[in-house]
């Protein structure tokens, strides 16, 4: 019997204990809603990013990569509208001083109340008054006036802090792709349709970050801007919708029961979007946005053309047409997806004799360690370390564990998602060239004896079987 963690606090405590995440600047009492990734968190994040890149870039004939700078010319943000419009409606409770985003306050009160993203302060206030939405913290209805708060982090480039040297940490990776559209298209001799993918850090001075790593002020995005002719926009949109859903289930291990699609009604659409659908996941705090797909029309390239006075049109050599390409944008936050995967995968499993274990049921490609090498007793440590070195030479992510009883070591590895435990025993000494060992599988706890030379084939076969099982769910 498997039971999920009941609260976010329980899950976070486990992840901190075993080395996935740590509170930022913890020796100085931390920094609110900032997290550092420990050894296991780094491995898991890198595996997730590599898995995404493989699926949406490497395996695609029409998608290439880009790594644009975090700090861009401020005119980029002027053209995109971020300088003037990238803000959240901020409201405070006069009674308890709690602070909220007005739009999220309304949404949490009743998700069926739809209000446009670019609504005025007066429109937000009217909804709050009409529905008498009180403070969730103290239950009082005593609000300040709503004011808008710009989310961009401002800093200065150079030694003089004046208006001429103001720059911003990027709030999204997308604009770095748009301003490089022509560079990529020309240098790679690309013909529409094609996509440009990027994984990188973004920064937003969020009013109310929280829910662990769900919403933080520093985060990573995995995005594609797919450029195309207007007529094919909805077909490409649907293609990505299906591909993303399949990938979330088969590669990331998310259950369809914990996923749902939310299409933004017209009044909720961003100013650049003609259609947006979010995949929402059932986090421990409830259903929230996980992975978005937006049809951005030709808005972005058009506004950059207007301000820069540079030609960002595309000339179709076959039809002799010249036009500004339209864009489909699939976008996901690394940390948010990581949180969904960890929520889905981590259980407390009841075993026989009233025993229990924490089981992190991560997919093979995501697991920080595929193998833990364990000597049965300490006198076998040298042989175990020799085999451990040979496994590392096979480019297999592995760890060495010789602390505590073999049972405790099994439990420790189960709790961090390690797929297999290899136990080096006295029979392993019989063949110096091709030693054998016991291999224990994480989920079933079944054990089998194999030789070192058989290990790569065994792992590939098991990974394939795991993938097939997930696809059949």
Curated annotation (Swiss-Prot):
Positions that bind substrate: 101, 172, 219-223, 329-333
Gene Ontology BP terms: glycyl-tRNA aminoacylation
Gene3D superfamilies: Anticodon-binding domain (3.40.50.800), Bira Bifunctional Protein, Domain 2 (3.30.930.10)
Record's GO cellular component terms: cytoplasm
Keyword vocabulary terms for this entry: Aminoacyl-tRNA synthetase, ATP-binding, Cytoplasm, Ligase, Nucleotide-binding, Protein biosynthesis
Intracellular or extracellular location(s): Cytoplasm
First-level EC class: ligase
Residues bound to ATP: 204-206, 214-219, 289-290, 333-336
Protein name per UniProt: Glycine--tRNA ligase
Family annotation (NCBIfam families): glyS_dimeric, PRK04173.1
Entry's family note: Belongs to the class-II aminoacyl-tRNA synthetase family.
Gene Ontology molecular function, alphabetical: ATP binding; glycine-tRNA ligase activity; protein dimerization activity
Free-text function comment from the UniProt entry: Catalyzes the attachment of glycine to tRNA(Gly).
Xref: PROSITE patterns: AA_TRNA_LIGASE_II
Pfam families for this protein: HGTP_anticodon, tRNA-synt_2b
Enzyme Commission number(s) from the entry: 6.1.1.14
InterPro entries: aa-tRNA-synt_IIb, aa-tRNA-synth_II, aa-tRNA-synth_II/BPL/LPL, Anticodon-bd, Anticodon-bd_dom_sf, Gly-tRNA_synthase/POLG2, Gly_tRNA_ligase_bac, GlyRS-like_core
Subunit structure of this chain's protein: Homodimer.
Reactions performed catalytically: tRNA(Gly) + glycine + ATP = glycyl-tRNA(Gly) + AMP + diphosphate
């Amino acid at each position: 019997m498997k039971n999920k963690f009941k609260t976010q606090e329980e899950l976070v405590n486990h992840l901190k204990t075993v080395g996935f995440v740590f509170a930022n600047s913890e020796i100085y009492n931390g920094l609110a809603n900032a997290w550092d990734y420990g050894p296991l968190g780094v491995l898991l994040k890198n595996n997730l990013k590599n898995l995404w890149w493989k699926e949406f870039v490497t395996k695609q004939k029409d998608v290439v990569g880009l790594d644009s700078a975090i700090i861009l010319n401020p005119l980029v943000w002027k053209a995109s509208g971020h300088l003037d419009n990238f803000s959240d409606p901020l409201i405070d409770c006069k009674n308890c001083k709690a602070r909220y985003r007005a739009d999220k306050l309304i949404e949490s009160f009743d998700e069926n109340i739809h209000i446009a993203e670019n609504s005025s302060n007066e429109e937000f206030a009217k909804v709050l008054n009409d529905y008498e939405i009180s403070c969730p913290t103290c239950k009082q209805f005593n609000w300040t006036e709503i004011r808008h708060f710009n989310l961009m982090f401002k800093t200065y480039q150079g030694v003089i802090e004046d208006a001429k040297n103001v720059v911003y940490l990027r709030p999204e990776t997308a604009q770095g792709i748009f301003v490089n559209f022509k560079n990529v298209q020309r240098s790679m001799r690309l013909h529409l349709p094609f996509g440009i993918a990027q994984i990188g850090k973004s920064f937003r001075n969020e009013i109310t970050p929280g829910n662990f790593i769900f919403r933080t002020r520093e985060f990573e995005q995995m995005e594609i801007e797919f450029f195309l002719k207007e007529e094919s926009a909805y077909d490409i949109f649907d293609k990505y919708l299906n591909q993303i859903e399949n990938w979330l289930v088969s590669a990331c291990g998310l259950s369809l029961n914990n996923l749902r699609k939310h299409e933004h009604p017209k009044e909720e659409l961003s100013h650049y979007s003609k259609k947006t659908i979010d995949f929402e996941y059932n986090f421990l705090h409830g259903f929230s946005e996980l992975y978005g797909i937006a049809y951005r029309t030709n808005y972005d390239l058009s506004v950059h053309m207007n301000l820069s006075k540079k030609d960002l049109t595309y000339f179709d050599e076959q039809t002799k047409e010249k036009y500004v390409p339209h864009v489909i944008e699939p976008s996901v936050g690394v940390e948010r997806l990581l949180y969904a995967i960890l929520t889905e995968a981590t259980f407390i499993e009841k075993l026989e004799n009233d025993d229990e274990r924490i089981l992190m049921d991560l997919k093979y490609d995501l697991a920080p360690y595929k193998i833990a090498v364990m000597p049965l007793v300490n006198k076998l440590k040298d042989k175990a370390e020799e085999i451990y070195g040979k496994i590392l030479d096979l480019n297999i992510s592995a760890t060495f564990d010789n602390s505590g009883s073999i049972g405790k070591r099994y439990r420790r590895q189960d709790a961090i998602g390690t797929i297999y435990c290899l136990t080096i025993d006295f029979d392993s000494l019989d063949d110096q060239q091709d030693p054998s060992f016991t291999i224990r599988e994480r989920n079933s706890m079944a054990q089998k004896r194999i030789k070192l030379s058989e290990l790569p084939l065994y792992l590939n076969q098991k990974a394939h079987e795991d993938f097939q099982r997930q696809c059949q769910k």
